[in-house]
């Protein structure tokens, strides 16, 4: 915590908030630009420039810590900027940039107003940046709602299709219900403790809470809200429908930014609030993890829609990540291992959904989401098929990919903390997942259909979206073979947490 004068404190606060301020400023500029003149290229470029400036400003914030010799900066009681928040802010901004690159060609064929897409995306990104830096439940709620409200519009952006409208309405209704649970749980905690900051709640939870039913009920309500947002069983039923109905770039954003930001916020909350002091909470988390892994993987087996399949797959992946939450106070390396898994999941998801976006651009009605659309892709787009194969193998956790390193680290955490049921569940779930990931992979190399329904442009590898897919595949391979630079990079950030 900083002990300098008020003026210096204010200056450091503003510097620490630089990425958030830049994204917020870009939102204002974009609104003015849209009001002045609708120009897709200009407004899309403004969005990308703003996000790049926010990304590079993270280096300035990182340098601020070394210059000021502080481990963290508390920006009001709501936000805490440290290595942890800088790392996850970087992942959020990278995923938002990737979404912009996938969305631009898709919007080129869109028959209505295009610029609002970038505005909604920026507001949602702003919420994600607030969420990963939150140290107060009020900031958590603000961040979650800033992510969710623009997503209602993004999910229904292809409103000419009934499925897109259905996805938006389903997410709206269920998200509102989950937010109600979250808010009611926070109210219960406040009624019992008189505070909502993570520090004050942590002090309460370090005492015995058996005799405080409001705290137990409040934590249960909050767990329901978090479970919905992370699409964990039994709050997951919206996920496949929303993934399938949303436009491909929005599915990319929802599956990466939305979930990664929330997981970062939830993990920071549980860093202060030890789960082992709350009766039944670890048991509930373990049940949600096991059920999510089995449900997600088993339901994905029979899917013929790639976006729906990835929706079920994401349920399983965040079931795996629950190991990190359960073992948070039992393994000193758990933050680094979860971060490696998040990086692997991010780049693998960007790669697969990036290929779907490339195949679906420009807008021509329904996305190229049927598995049949990818049959024989190798025979007319061999490099794209190779890239997609790498990403699918990484999601499956096959050796020589980053996904294998990430899953190995999570298994190591489960073994070190004696979570034997979860260890067995991860092994069985991974074996099931191997089938449906290989099913997609094999179809890429089968004989192609006589007529191609959807295809990428011939110069896809030189487009912005193609470059993102290339880079993602390269990182997944390089860090899968030699992960030490990534691990050292992550440890450097966690040293300031």
Curated annotation (Swiss-Prot):
Transmembrane intervals: 14-34, 45-65, 86-106, 116-136, 137-157, 171-191, 215-235, 253-273, 281-301, 309-329, 338-358, 385-405, 420-439, 461-481
Q: What does the record give as EC number?
A: 7.1.1.-
Its domain of life? Bacteria
Q: What Pfam families does the record point to?
A: Proton_antipo_M
- Its EC top class is translocase
Q: Which GO terms describe its cellular component?
A: plasma membrane
- What is the topology of this protein in the membrane according to its UniProt annotation? Multi-pass membrane protein
Reactions catalysed according to its record:
a quinone + NADH + 5 H(+)(in) = a quinol + NAD(+) + 4 H(+)(out)
MF annotations from Gene Ontology = NADH dehydrogenase (ubiquinone) activity; NADH:ubiquinone reductase (non-electrogenic) activity; quinone binding
Q: Give UniProt keywords alphabetically.
A: Cell membrane, Membrane, NAD, Quinone, Translocase, Transmembrane, Transmembrane helix, Transport, Ubiquinone
The record's subcellular location field reads: Cell membrane
- Offer one example of a GO biological process linked to this entry: ATP synthesis coupled electron transport
Q: Name the family the entry cites.
A: Belongs to the complex I subunit 2 family.
How this chain assembles, per its entry, is: NDH-1 is composed of 13 different subunits. Subunits NuoA, H, J, K, L, M, N constitute the membrane sector of the complex.
Q: What does this protein do?
A: NDH-1 shuttles electrons from NADH, via FMN and iron-sulfur (Fe-S) centers, to quinones in the respiratory chain. The immediate electron acceptor for the enzyme in this species is believed to be ubiquinone. Couples the redox reaction to proton translocation (for every two electrons transferred, four hydrogen ions are translocated across the cytoplasmic membrane), and thus conserves the redox energy in a proton gradient.
Name of the protein in question: NADH-quinone oxidoreductase subunit N
Q: Which organism is it from?
A: Hamiltonella defensa subsp. Acyrthosiphon pisum (strain 5AT)
